[in-house]
Amino acid sequence: MRKSHVLVLAGILLLLSPVLSQQKSLKVVLLYDMEGVSGATSVRHTDFGANPEYEEARKSLTADVNAAIAGLKAGGATEIIVVDGHGSGNSQGPDVLEAELLPPAKMISRDRSFDIYMDSYDQSVDAIVTVAMHAGAGNPAGFLSHTYTIEDIQYRVNGTPFNETMIMAMGAARFGIPIIMVSGDDQLEKEIRRYLPWIKYASGKRAAGRTKAEPFPREEVSRRIEKAAREALLALDTARLPENFPGPFRFALTFQDESQARTVAGLQGAELLADSVSVQIRSVDFEEGYRASLRLISAAGLVGRVQAMQRVLTAQPNAAALRDAVSKYITDRWLDPQPAPPAPGGAGAPQRYWGAR
């Protein structure tokens, strides 16, 4: 090949290099929750029972998610996997209006439940964004603030208060995957700025306490989310992982009362702390410690629900009769066990799981 031809070919490749670089495959996981939806201003907006507020919030959620999809696509994403992080997906379908998602986004569903913070991604993913998230437990100013459970159990790792976005960030760090963009209320933004300040953030509303929020205008929110998602993906090369990864790790859970803490003390190696309402477990592996903490939360949650039922029961005018009925049911089930009833719907289509727990 002549030298002149080599120079011409080199010039063509130089001209094409921006185009070729833009065609690089970029896979992004988009996980959404619902408390941080721009249009969700009361707890009924997040309750997937049959109520008009929930259906209204689904439309707002879809607008938030689509704004992020548009931004990611503009930033070069070639594959966008959407994960339901609110929990409704395990009962009736995803919270988002799946048929209205913009391309190239696709929902994932599986034939068994999976943990959204540990199991919704693998090494093939380049980045993660989380949409419509909320502040963590212990933040009294955050709209519907909690971490993993509405039992209001405060969750700390190595002394740092954790919200669910931070759990996701630590889980993804196992594979070197960064969270690059988050949306939610202004209280979550403060938490993210404090602990993960390099992440792009789009605020959709102002929290007015735990039970109320003041949304920003719809078009403004969509612009914010789209811009943050686009800029975050374009700056992927500068993305960072949480600084305290790898461990070892101390997972501390602070419960609402002492009975919950004492119930789980000793389980999963948990030790009761001096305040008598907190327990702590240690792990050299984040995922292992996280999954152990969930088992403690589940056990404590049973205690909390039983206590709540007892208090409600006691307040009823026919409390004694109700207690007798419960006692009789338990005794009858013990002495005369009956076969389990058939599953609703018979042997129809298998259960599908879109995401959260």
Set out the residue ranges of the language-model regions:
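Bacterial N-terminal signal peptides that target proteins for export
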Residues: 1-8
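Bacterial N-terminal signal peptides
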Residues: 8-18
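Boundary at the C-terminal end of the N-terminal hydrophobic targeting segment
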Residues: 19-23
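Glycine-rich nucleotide/cofactor/substrate-binding loop typically near the N-terminus or early
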Residues: 24-26, 40-41, 65-123
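Short catalytic helix/loop segments, enriched in acidic residues and glycine
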Residues: 46-67
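C-terminal accessory domains and tails appended to enzymatic cores
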Residues: 80, 221, 228-357
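Divalent-metal (Mg2+/Mn2+/Ca2+)-assisted nucleotide/phosphate chemistry catalytic cores
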Residues: 105, 117-174, 178-182, 201
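Glycine-rich, Lys/Arg-enriched anion-binding loops that position phosphate/diphosphate groups
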Residues: 161-265
